[in-house]
From Swiss-Prot:
<dbReference type="GO" id="GO:0006730">
    <property type="term" value="P:one-carbon metabolic process"/>
</dbReference>
<dbReference type="Pfam" id="PF00438">
    <property type="entry name" value="S-AdoMet_synt_N"/>
</dbReference>
<dbReference type="GO" id="GO:0005524">
    <property type="term" value="F:ATP binding"/>
</dbReference>
<feature type="binding site" description="in other chain">
    <location>
        <position position="99"/>
    </location>
    <ligand>
        <name>L-methionine</name>
    </ligand>
</feature>
<dbReference type="InterPro" id="IPR002133">
    <property type="entry name" value="S-AdoMet_synthetase"/>
</dbReference>
<feature type="binding site">
    <location>
        <position position="43"/>
    </location>
    <ligand>
        <name>K(+)</name>
    </ligand>
</feature>
<dbReference type="InterPro" id="IPR022629">
    <property type="entry name" value="S-AdoMet_synt_central"/>
</dbReference>
<dbReference type="InterPro" id="IPR022636">
    <property type="entry name" value="S-AdoMet_synthetase_sfam"/>
</dbReference>
<keyword id="KW-0808">Transferase</keyword>
<keyword id="KW-0554">One-carbon metabolism</keyword>
<feature type="binding site" description="in other chain">
    <location>
        <position position="56"/>
    </location>
    <ligand>
        <name>L-methionine</name>
    </ligand>
</feature>
<feature type="binding site" description="in other chain">
    <location>
        <begin position="166"/>
        <end position="168"/>
    </location>
    <ligand>
        <name>ATP</name>
    </ligand>
</feature>
<keyword id="KW-0963">Cytoplasm</keyword>
<feature type="binding site">
    <location>
        <position position="268"/>
    </location>
    <ligand>
        <name>ATP</name>
    </ligand>
</feature>
<keyword id="KW-0460">Magnesium</keyword>
<comment type="subunit">
    <text>Homotetramer; dimer of dimers.</text>
</comment>
<feature type="binding site">
    <location>
        <position position="241"/>
    </location>
    <ligand>
        <name>L-methionine</name>
    </ligand>
</feature>
């Protein structure tokens, strides 16, 4: 019998790196609301008393970057010097420039379907049937823990009013013969107000944050709980650590279970294949698994800057495929257009839906329909997390001739 442990972690929306991610994606959303053809590469750094927003942006839109940055910080919960960071009074430094015209000449085409990739690179997508979200269980549970922390913290008349925005989670699972059998260890560290006793904090976190999230069937007498194991966690957020866009790429994806091409997501418009192709690869892998072609599937795509067609598409199902990996790859090429324009059209990506992806994972979330007013004052309907749909599973299964 095969037995092993696997661990994944997540961080809350108040973690400094995630504050930076959310600011970068808020800038992207504000621009896409007015200009769907914009080119955006926005990076943010947050540290004590200041947010620095930099990058390369080419757009016809105008946004109030300072007000936008402050709103994101305050909405997260950094709204007072008592918390250590105040979005209303912190400095905001704008260091945004224009994108190189040499990149534009390689990406833009007269025919939109011939649009070239915004950069070279390799991207991975992954899916597994071990959870309803088609995500690895450890990262799924880690996300839900810090999501619950924020939910309780922001709740009106919260029973845990002393919670602060910064938090981290970690879940270690035991696998028996490739299937989750138990939770071996849980780590939950949360920033808190001064004066809370460690004993009270541990009890409250277990009851209000951990218990509602973790499946009882996987808990046992030997499960280890590490709640604020260092003791006090009063200094957090951008005061405790410098935050940067793009530093939580494993949290953003599959918690270390699948491979990663190295490119971050936040602050990048859909012409950047670092983001859009990673979303497309997840969409492909999820539909392959949802179709029953495999229990696990990892898809890799790669691109050359200025070139529309992917330089490679490869698939592995780790021995779980119901048909060969070669046949699955042929089906992928037939059913999915993985050129940059094809991805943007397939997933309808040129809409302001990215700030909500910047915390609690870009994958494993439910597709969410929404509407917004564009720059012309017209109402536009769109779907966030469109890459989580399984709308091509039936066609894949039929074409694979599986009963």
């Amino acid at each position: 019998m095969s037995s092993y442990l696997f661990t994944s972690e997540s961080v809350s929306e108040g973690h400094p790196d995630k504050v930076a991610d959310q600011i970068s994606d808020a800038v992207l959303d504000a621009i896409l609301t007015q200009d769907q053809r914009a080119r955006v590469a926005c990076e943010t750094m947050v540290k004590t008393g200041v947010a620095i927003v930099a990058g390369e942006i080419t757009t016809s839109a105008w946004i109030d970057l300072e007000a936008l940055t402050r709103k994101v910080i305050v909405d997260i919960g950094y709204d007072s010097s008592d918390v250590g960071f105040d979005g209303a009074t912190c400095g905001v430094l704008n260091l945004i420039g224009k994108q190189s015209p040499h990149i534009a000449q390689g990406v833009d085409r007269k025919k939109p379907e011939e649009m070239g990739a915004g950069d070279q690179g390799l991207m991975f997508g992954y899916a597994t049937n071990e959870t309803d979200s088609y995500m690895p269980a450890a990262i799924h549970l880690s996300h839900r823990l810090v999501e619950q922390q924020a939910k309780i913290r922001k709740k009106k008349n919260s029973p845990l009013s002393w919670l602060r925005p910064d938090a981290k989670s970690q879940v270690t699972l035991r696998y028996e013969n490739g299937v989750v059998s138990a939770i071996d260890a849980v780590v939950l560290s949360t920033q808190h107000a001064p004066g809370i006793k460690q004993k009270d904090l541990i009890e409250a976190v277990r009851e209000e944050i951990i218990k509602p999230v973790l499946p009882a069937k996987w808990l046992h007498k030997g499960t280890k709980f590490h709640i604020n194991p260092t003791g006090k966690f009063e200094i957090g957020g951008p005061v405790g650590d410098c935050g940067l866009t793009g530093r939580k790429i494993i949290v953003d994806t599959y918690g270390g279970w699948a491979r990663h091409g190295g490119g971050a997501f936040s602050g990048k418009d859909p012409s950047k294949v670092d983001r859009s192709a990673a979303y497309a690869a997840r969409y492909v892998a999820k539909n392959v698994v949802a179709a029953g072609l495999a229990d696990r599937c990892e898809v890799q795509v790669s691109y050359a800057i200025g070139v529309a067609e992917p330089t490679s598409i490869s698939v592995t199902t780790f021995g779980t495929g119901k048909i060969s990996d070669d046949k699955i790859e042929k089906l992928i090429r037939k059913h999915f257009d993985l050129r940059p324009y094809g991805i943007i059209k397939m997933l309808d990506l040129v809409h302001p839906m990215y700030q909500q992806t910047a915390a609690y994972g870009h994958f494993g979330r439910k597709p969410k329909e929404f509407s917004y007013l564009n720059g012309e004052g017209e109402t536009v309907n769109a779907t966030a997390f469109s890459w989580e749909k399984t709308d091509r599973a039936a066609a894949l299964r039929a074409d694979a001739k599986l009963k």
